[in-house]
Amino acid sequence: MVNEQIIDISGPLKGEIEVPGDKSMTHRAIMLASLAEGVSTIYKPLLGEDCRRTMDIFRLLGVEIKEDDEKLVVTSPGYQSFNTPHQVLYTGNSGTTTRLLAGLLSGLGIESVLSGDVSIGKRPMDRVLRPLKLMDANIEGIEDNYTPLIIKPSVIKGINYQMEVASAQVKSAILFASLFSKEPTIIKELDVSRNHTETMFKHFNIPIEAEGLSINTTPEAIRYIKPADFHVPGDISSAAFFIVAALITPGSDVTIHNVGINPTRSGIIDIVEKMGGNIQLFNQTTGAEPTASIRIQYTPMLQPITIEGELVPKAIDELPVIALLCTQAVGTSTIKDAEELKVKETNRIDTTADMLNLLGFELQPTNDGLIIYPSEFKTNATVDSLTDHRIGMMLAVASLLSSEPVKIKQFDAVNVSFPGFLPKLKLLENEG
C-alpha cells in the first residue's frame, strides 16, 4: 500500500454529489446474477477491490462478466454448469465475499478453497462455519475458525437456527446455502440486521418469507431463480463520510443524491436526527431498496447520544465516523452493544479510539463500544488507516477540524469501497 497521503482540505464544503454504488448490494447482485442462467445487467455497481474479488471468482466458475460504462453485463451458463476451479479462490480483503461464498459454494457442493489477504486471515469464521456444519456442509478452516476454507461436496439440509450475533454476513451465508437444501430453513435473528439478501432473493424470483425477526426459506429455492436487471443505489456507508463532514465543517451545505435508505441500514440518519443535526431527505423512492437525496448543513451544538441495541446493526459500518461526529457534541456520548466492530477489517473499537486520540480527541474504548467526550483536534500526529478503508476515510474527515494538513499512512485502503473518495471531497472544497 502507498505509504502516506497528505490530506489538505478546508471548508466550507458545498455542492451536490453522488457516491459509489452500495457494496453489500453489488456483491449480492453479482452472486445472484451469476447463479441465474441467462443475461442480467447491474447498473451503477461499486467496482472497488472487494466487489472485483467476487467478480473474479465467478469468472473462474465460468460466468462472463463484462464492464461497460457504469454497468456490468453478467452472462451465466447457470449454477448447474459451473466449472470446478483448479486454483484457490482469492477473496482479498472482502469479508462479504469470503463468508457469503462459504455458504454458496457449500450449497453448490463445488470442491474449492477460499482464501484472502492477511487481514481476512485474522478474521473469525467460526460464526459462519458452525451453522453451515449444522446444515451438513463439508467445510473446514484453520483451527475451525480461519481461512483458508476448504469446501468439499455434500448434501445440504435445512435447519432451524437461532442467530448468535446480529450479523448479515452470517445470516446470508446460511440463506445462500439453504437455496440447495431439500428442507426449509428457519432463521431467528437477535436484532434486525441488513436485509439485502432477502430483498434481492425476491428480485431474482427466489421465494423467501421474512416477518419480524424470523426468516423462512423454501426447499430447493434455487430452482426458481431467474436473471434480472438491478439498479444499485448509492452506498449509505460511503455517504456517511460526507454527512459527517458537512455537519462538523462550518458553512457547509452538501447534497448527496440517490442514496440507499433501506431501513435496516439507515441508522446514521436516525442518529444524526437524534443529535439535532440539520439533515433533510427528499426525492424519496419506495420499493424493496428505497432511495433518497440527502441534504446536510453544518450544525453547531450537536446533542450527545447513546447508541445501543437495535440501532447498532443499522449503523455498524458507520460507527467509526459517527464516533468522530460525537466528539463535536456538547456532552459525553456512548456506543454500546457493538462487539461486532472487533471482527471487521481491524478491531474498529480500538483503531477508532487509538487514531482519534493520537489527534487529540478523547475517546475511551470499552468491551462493547466507546465513550466519546467533547473534544477537539489538538495535534498533527501522523495517523494510519491500518489497511482499514473506513478508518482511512474517517481520518480524512477528521482532518477538516484541523487548520494544518494531516498525514495518513496506508490511505489507499479506501479503494476497497470508495475509489475516488479524495477527489470527491476536494470537489466539494472547490465548490465551497
Curated annotation (Swiss-Prot):
A Gene Ontology biological process noted in the UniProt record is: aromatic amino acid family biosynthetic process
Q: Which residues form the active site?
A: 317
Positions annotated to bind phosphoenolpyruvate: 23, 95, 123, 169, 348, 390
User: Which GO molecular function terms does the record list?
Assistant: 3-phosphoshikimate 1-carboxyvinyltransferase activity
- Pfam families assigned: EPSP_synthase
Q: Which GO terms describe its cellular component?
A: cytoplasm
Q: Which SUPFAM superfamilies does this UniProt record tie to the protein?
A: EPT/RTPC-like
Q: What is its main location?
A: cytoplasm
| Keywords annotated in UniProt | Amino-acid biosynthesis, Aromatic amino acid biosynthesis, Cytoplasm, Transferase
What does the entry list as the binding residues for 3-phosphoshikimate?
A: 23-24, 28, 167, 169, 317, 344
Cellular localisation: Cytoplasm
Q: Does the keyword Amino-acid biosynthesis apply?
A: yes
What is the residue range of the signal peptide feature? none
Reaction catalysed by this chain?
3-phosphoshikimate + phosphoenolpyruvate = 5-O-(1-carboxyvinyl)-3-phosphoshikimate + phosphate
> Hey, which family's this protein in?
Belongs to the EPSP synthase family.
Official protein name in the record? 3-phosphoshikimate 1-carboxyvinyltransferase
Question: What phylogenetic lineage does the species belong to?
Answer: Bacteria, Bacillati, Bacillota, Bacilli, Bacillales
